[in-house]
Amino acid sequence: MSSFDYLKSAIKQKGCTLDEVAEPSGMTKGYLSQLLNRKIKARARRS
């Protein structure tokens, strides 16, 4: 299970929407959706 599979499962179990998760994490709903559905790869974090 990848990190994104775990995150997707946790979001579903908590009954959260993508909006509720994306905003506090600094992502757009669209970007988060693409990550969770493996449409794109996560960018490396910059220091």
Curated annotation (Swiss-Prot):
GO cellular component, one term: plasma membrane
Domain (HTH cro/C1-type): residue spans on this chain: 7-47
Broad class of enzyme this protein falls into: transferase
GO biological process, one term: NAD biosynthetic process
Pathway: Cofactor biosynthesis; NAD(+) biosynthesis [regulation]; Cofactor biosynthesis; NAD(+) biosynthesis; NAD(+) from nicotinamide D-ribonucleotide: step 1/1
EC code: 2.7.7.1, 2.7.1.22
Keyword tags: ATP-binding, Cell membrane, Cytoplasm, DNA-binding, Kinase, Membrane, Multifunctional enzyme, NAD, Nucleotide-binding, Pyridine nucleotide biosynthesis, Repressor, Transcription, Transcription regulation, Transferase
InterPro entries linked: Cro/C1-type_HTH, Lambda_DNA-bd_dom_sf
Protein's UniProt keywords contain Iron: no
Transmembrane spans: none
Membrane topology: Peripheral membrane protein
DNA bind region: 18-37
Compartments, as annotated in UniProt: Cell membrane; Cytoplasm
A GO MF label: DNA binding
Job of this protein: This enzyme has three activities: DNA binding, nicotinamide mononucleotide (NMN) adenylyltransferase and ribosylnicotinamide (RN) kinase. The DNA-binding domain binds to the nadB operator sequence in an NAD- and ATP-dependent manner. As NAD levels increase within the cell, the affinity of NadR for the nadB operator regions of nadA, nadB, and pncB increases, repressing the transcription of these genes. The RN kinase activity catalyzes the phosphorylation of RN to form nicotinamide ribonucleotide.
Name of the protein in its database record: Trifunctional NAD biosynthesis/regulator protein NadR
Organism expressing this protein natively: Klebsiella pneumoniae
